[in-house]
A protein has these predicted regions:
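Extracellular/periplasmic periplasmic-binding protein-like sensory domains
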Residues: 1-43, 56-57, 107, 111-114
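Segments of small-molecule ligand-sensing domains
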Residues: 31-103, 115-116
Length: 116
């Protein structure tokens, strides 16, 4: 992307880059290989299942716990599930620069409340 003149200074939404760098460094130390970019999705899914499995036996994987409006924090940032089955992510806004990507607006740490 950095070499494409039409994208120079363009903005796009993406997971926070620092978290993936940390994840990738740990992965390389452990497996002596670079992780596929989508490895964080699997990691976050398993982490969520581990978190929910620690809950009360009758309330572990219910619609209510899976659609917690506060969401969950993963390697790729904040995410939550809605009643209709869709997912929402808290993404950063990055800018394309010749030297790489710069963060224009960091990813949110929490979702805004649904109240008015």
């Amino acid at each position: 992307m950095q070499r494409e003149p039409g994208l120079s200074n363009g903005w796009f939404a993406a997971p926070p880059p620092a978290a993936f760098r940390d994840f990738a460094a740990h992965y390389r130390r452990t497996y002596n290989a670079n992780p596929p970019r989508i490895a964080t999705l699997s990691y976050d899914a398993i982490s969520l299942m581990a978190l929910l499995s620690d809950g009360r036996p009758y309330d572990r994987f219910t619609d209510r716990t899976l659609t917690d409006p506060n969401g969950f924090s993963g390697v790729d940032g904040l995410f939550r599930f809605h009643d209709d089955g869709s997912a929402e992510r808290g993404l950063a806004v990055l800018q394309v620069a010749p030297s790489g990507f710069t963060v224009v607006d960091p990813a949110p740490k929490t979702f805004p409340s649904a109240g008015f």
